[in-house]
């Protein structure tokens, strides 16, 4: 949704982004706004993100006191690769504009209702999806000399992958499938998980180490491992000047502000950070809201008022200053 109130030659612009996709969770909340679709709910606050952005745009539509062009971006596909942000940018909707900032927010139960959270520089991790299919020769569990055991190879692979964890890397395997039985070794096993990093160089190094580990295990166990690394979202890196401006504005508006720690979770907002000055901040909804990605998550609606007021004020500051 694009609004413009400026002479044709003024190309200044600001982009306000809200993600809008839901999650495959059956909602257990008993409220007026609960999901009407079984097995799907807004378990991560994206409905509140959309409500805040809608409120900002509605306010500007009634009193368009900004200069330049304001983009209201309701973005799908944040929760899964390749990320809706990458698909939006592939269409080049902001080409020819002087984009002063791409701004996004996310609800945060660990902050009090209405509190705003900021972090300059690196904020959220890059994320990749890992898949491994280890193929060997199965058979009777008593005849091990006749086997090329994919379970043993897979167990060693899992152990060595987890050993990669450190300050610059968070690697988890969340799914293992093998089949077989007490006396049957299967022909193959399957594993999948995620890799999260904060440095592009380190990201590439770990990708190569994963391939080397798999090849070494193949050689010693006589198996063949198919490694698939699905490159996902880049790091969310907040523009330091924008963080200073936003923090000062929030304090001037008498809002409570907290500085945020580095997070190992990921967000496709990182794609915007690679192309434009960007700011991704947190909107407190209180601990009583519950935990995101659960069937009872319900952000406190009182945060919406703060969310609208701050995002509107920030957009005005970005567009109206020379």
Task: Indicate residue ranges for each PLM-predicted region.
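Acidic/His- and Gly-rich active-site-bordering loop/insert found
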Residues: 1-42, 51-54, 58-67
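Hydrophobic/aromatic beta-strand patches that form the interior of the parallel beta-sheet core
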Residues: 14, 73, 101-103, 251, ...
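Non-cysteine beta-strand/loop elements that form the S-adenosyl-L-methionine
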Residues: 15-17, 130-132, 280-286
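Residues at alpha-helix caps and immediate loop-helix transition turns in enzyme cores, especially N-
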Residues: 52, 84-85, 146, 206, ...
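Metal-dependent amide/peptide-bond hydrolase catalytic core
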Residues: 151-322
């Amino acid at each position: 949704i694009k609004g413009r109130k400026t002479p044709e030659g003024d190309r200044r612009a600001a982009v306000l982004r809200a993600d809008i996709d839901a999650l495959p969770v059956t909602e257990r909340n008993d409220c007026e706004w609960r999901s009407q679709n079984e097995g799907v709910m807004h378990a991560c606050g994206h409905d509140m993100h959309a409500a805040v952005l809608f409120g900002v745009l509605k306010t500007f539509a009634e009193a368009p006191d900004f200069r330049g062009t304001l983009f209201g971006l309701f973005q799908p596909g944040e929760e899964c690769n390749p990320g809706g942000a990458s698909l939006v940018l592939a269409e080049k909707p902001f080409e020819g504009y002087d984009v002063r900032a791409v701004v996004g927010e996310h609800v945060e139960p660990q902050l009090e209702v209405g509190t705003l959270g900021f972090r300059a520089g690196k904020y959220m991790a890059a994320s990749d999806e890992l898949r491994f299919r280890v193929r060997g020769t199965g058979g009777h569990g008593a005849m091990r000399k006749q086997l090329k055991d994919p379970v043993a190879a897979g167990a060693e692979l899992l152990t060595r992958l987890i050993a990669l964890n450190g300050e610059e890397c968070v690697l988890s395997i969340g799914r293992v499938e093998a089949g077989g039985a007490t006396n049957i070794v299967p022909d193959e096993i399957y594993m999948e998980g995620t890799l999260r990093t904060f440095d592009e160089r380190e990201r590439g190094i770990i990708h190569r180490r994963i391939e080397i580990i798999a090849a070494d295990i193949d050689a010693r166990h006589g198996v063949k491992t198919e490694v698939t690394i699905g490159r996902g979202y880049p790091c969310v890196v907040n523009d330091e000047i924008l963080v200073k401006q936003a923090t000062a504005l929030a304090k001037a508006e008498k809002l409570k502000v907290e500085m945020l720690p580095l997070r190992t979770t990921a967000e496709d907002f990182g794609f915007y950070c690679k192309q434009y000055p960007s700011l991704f901040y947190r909107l407190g909804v209180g601990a009583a809201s519950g935990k995101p990605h659960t069937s009872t998550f319900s952000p406190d609606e009182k945060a919406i008022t703060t969310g609208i007021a701050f995002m509107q004020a920030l957009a005005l500051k970005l567009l109206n200053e020379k």
